[in-house]
Curated annotation (Swiss-Prot):
Protein name (database record): F17d-G fimbrial adhesin
Residues spanning the signal sequence: 1-22
UniProt feature coiled coil, ranges: none
Pfam family, one: Fimbrial
Organism lineage string: Bacteria, Pseudomonadati, Pseudomonadota, Gammaproteobacteria, Enterobacterales
Region (Receptor-binding lectin domain): 23-199
Record GO cellular component, one term: pilus
Membrane spanning stretches: none
SUPFAM superfamilies: Bacterial adhesins (SSF49401)
Species for this entry: Escherichia coli
């Protein structure tokens, strides 16, 4: 009788110990590859439509529903961190640099791609607030990473190759009294190598690149008051564009490149004083302002020349004398403005 009791007690203790096992275990891989290997993606876009996002869907990613096994009321969330350098932003989301020409938008989160958090910066951030498994049930916790390439720089059509690159990590975050103990909590991700076949569209200038506008001779009496204007000359700019290109332009004051007003600085060869030059486009009643010599989208004082439906756009420019209010002294008037096109 005594021996039977000892055997029964030993079995009871064994069953008790099995019940008290940890409520979380790691069943995934510590190193994971994101996207097909190798990947190849092709897109066409206007030359200056930058940064240009390669919308490839969800196929550049990694998702796994079974990374941690959890049970017994265990509560778990996820944190994510990106290790790549931040080189810009788009709609509040960081653009991470891969090469000088190619960057990434990155999302991290729960198993489902659609619930991923848009990543910003290089610190750990909450990418899945979490949940608690039932006290008498078991389940798994997964994760996902999705990336989208971004073209960063103005270039002609090109093929970009990106080597395998470490992206960052996701870690399991126990909460509400749950503890992971010695269980693996962090997994790492690397982006598989890929190529971008990038085709850009643009325009060709049909007008000579240097345009001389002869200014009409006038008398000071035609500009009696400050702000008075008289048409001095006119010219046109014509282009031939690929389909779908929207043309924007910036005029830059060549004599004073920092000038952001609507009056062109006269060159040192001018002898007249108290007079300036304004430039108008088409039938606009507001003069164009001068900006930096740059094709970057959103450049200061950039203005729209055409829409994406025009393949042979043109613009008529009118140059007007303007009384600057400093007292007019007759003489010669010369001004130089450059124009920079942006193909968006």
């Amino acid at each position: 009788m005594t021996n039977f009791y000892k055997v029964f007690l030993a079995v009871f203790i064994l069953v008790c110990c099995n019940i008290s096992q940890a409520a979380v275990s790691f069943i995934g891989s510590t190193e994971n590859d994101v996207g097909p290997s190798p990947g190849s993606y092709s897109r066409t876009h206007a030359m200056d439509n930058l940064p240009f996002v390669y919308n490839t869907g969800n196929n550049i990613g990694y998702q796994n529903a079974n990374v941690w096994r959890i049970s017994k009321g265990f509560c778990v969330g996820l944190d994510g961190k990106v290790d790549l350098p931040v080189v810009g932003s788009l709609d509040g989301q960081s653009i991470y640099g891969l090469t000088e020409e190619v960057g990434l938008l990155i999302w991290m989160g729960d198993t489902n791609y659609s619930r991923g958090t848009a990543m910003s910066g290089n610190s750990w951030e909450n990418v899945f607030s979490g949940w608690c498994v039932g006290a008498n049930t078991a389940s798994t916790q997964g994760l996902s990473v999705r990336v989208t390439p971004v073209i960063l720089k103005r270039n002609s059509s090109a093929r970009y190759s990106v080597q395998k690159t470490s992206i960052g990590s996701i870690r399991m975050r126990p909460y509400n009294g749950s503890s992971a103990g010695s269980v693996q909590t962090t997994v790492n991700f690397s982006l598989n190598p890929f190529t971008l076949n990038d085709t850009v569209t643009s325009c060709r200038l049909l007008t000579p690149s240097a345009v001389n506008v002869s200014l009409a001779a006038i008398s000071a009496g035609q500009l009696p008051s400050s702000g008075d204007e008289v048409v001095a000359g006119t010219t046109s700019l014509k282009l031939q564009c690929d389909a779908g290109v929207t043309v924007w332009a910036t005029l830059t004051d060549a004599t004073t490149p920092s000038n952001r007003s609507d009056i062109l600085t006269l060159t040192g060869a001018s002898t007249a004083t108290g007079v300036g030059l304004r430039i108008y486009k088409n039938t606009d009643s507001t003069p164009l302002k001068f900006g930096p010599d740059s094709p970057v989208k959103g450049n200061e004082n950039q203005w729209q020349l055409s829409t994406g439906t025009e393949t042979s756009p043109s613009v008529r420019l009118y140059v007007k004398y303007v009384n600057t209010g400093e007292g007019i002294n007759p003489g010669t008037v010369n001004g130089i403005s450059t124009f920079t096109f942006s193909y968006q």
